[in-house]
């Protein structure tokens, strides 16, 4: 089982990395999902996510999440082949937590160097995005 800290990691890169690990049969736990970042213009990102929310309605989808852990989980799921059993089972092996839960030991947590933000000017965390969407 891999425990990955999502603090200061790029949202899309982390999702792609985790999706690959899940398809290889690993169990993955992601902690601190609210501290993952999306790079780009803040206003553009917020408008893009709000536009997605406006597409669906209460009775008819698509349904887009508003909380940080569900936003990250949805992006991982979008990178998996959901129509076949292999993809569904892979997504079931993924657990995403907003913060560090008590049942996860902090000694085994690893940071993935390939997906870290270095010197990026425009970023927004999933927590800030969630507040803008009304999820927190």
Curated annotation (Swiss-Prot):
InterPro entries: Ribosomal_uL13, Ribosomal_uL13_bac-type, Ribosomal_uL13_euk/arc, Ribosomal_uL13_sf. CDD domains: Ribosomal_L13. Keywords: Ribonucleoprotein, Ribosomal protein. SUPFAM superfamilies: Ribosomal protein L13. The keyword Translocase does not apply. It comes from the Archaea. GO terms for cellular component: cytosolic large ribosomal subunit. The keyword Ribosomal protein applies. HAMAP family: Ribosomal_uL13 (MF_01366). Belongs to the universal ribosomal protein uL13 family. This protein is one of the early assembly proteins of the 50S ribosomal subunit, although it is not seen to bind rRNA by itself. It is important during the early stages of 50S assembly. This is Large ribosomal subunit protein uL13. It comes from Thermoplasma volcanium (strain ATCC 51530 / DSM 4299 / JCM 9571 / NBRC 15438 / GSS1). The lineage of its organism: Archaea, Methanobacteriati, Thermoplasmatota, Thermoplasmata, Thermoplasmatales.
